[in-house]
Amino acid sequence: MDDTDLQILSHLQRNGRLTMVELGKLVGLSSPSAAERVRKLEDKGVITGYSANICYEKLNKHVTAFILMEPKSCKHYAAFATSHPDVAENHRITGMYSYVTKVVTESVHTLEDFIDTSMAHGKPTTLVVLSSSSCHPAF
């Protein structure tokens, strides 16, 4: 993987809807060359898919929180989190807690409902997001 591949990844991460013509111009390649590089990155499993960034507030989900969970059973908590509609992400982690769960919900009341329900699976510690900044991993 060379610097051009890293540039391609960076541009696609910011805007996965770029055309190959636009991407080629951004990285100094012809559109067929850019398309070939993208195809190779997909074939190697470096690019695993494309997704949309969602503005949750437009969906009436105004509260984001991270739940640090000490579950009674990792298997049961993972099943609970995976099936809950307010869970955007759930990660198994090391350290004092076993999971960090990103919850996006309508209000503090629905967050409280989630916390109360999650207590059947262990001990949650809740961190409410006040603001966020857009970040992209550096390559």
Swiss-Prot record:
SUPFAM superfamilies, per database record: Dimeric alpha+beta barrel (SSF54909), Winged helix' DNA-binding domain (SSF46785)
Nucleotide-binding listed as a keyword: no
Gene3D superfamilies: 3.30.70.920, Winged helix-like DNA-binding domain superfamily/Winged helix DNA-binding domain
A GO term, aspect molecular function: sequence-specific DNA binding
Disulfide bonds: none
Pfam families hit by this protein: AsnC_trans_reg (PF01037), HTH_24 (PF13412)
Domain HTH asnC-type: 1-62
Gene Ontology terms: biological process: response to amino acid
DNA-binding residue intervals: 20-39
Domain of life: Bacteria
Alphabetical list of PROSITE patterns matching this protein: HTH_ASNC_1, HTH_ASNC_2
InterPro entries: ArsR-like_HTH (IPR011991), AsnC-type_HTH_dom (IPR000485), Dimeric_a/b-barrel (IPR011008), Tscrpt_reg_AsnC-like (IPR019888), Tscrpt_reg_AsnC/Lrp_C (IPR019887), Tscrpt_reg_HTH_AsnC-type_CS (IPR019885), WH-like_DNA-bd_sf (IPR036388), WH_DNA-bd_sf (IPR036390)
Gene Ontology CC annotations of this record: cytosol
Keywords: DNA-binding, Transcription, Transcription regulation
PANTHER family xrefs: LEUCINE-RESPONSIVE REGULATORY PROTEIN
Protein name: Uncharacterized HTH-type transcriptional regulator YezC
Organism, as annotated: Bacillus subtilis (strain 168)
Lineage: Bacteria, Bacillati, Bacillota, Bacilli, Bacillales
This protein's encoding gene: yezC
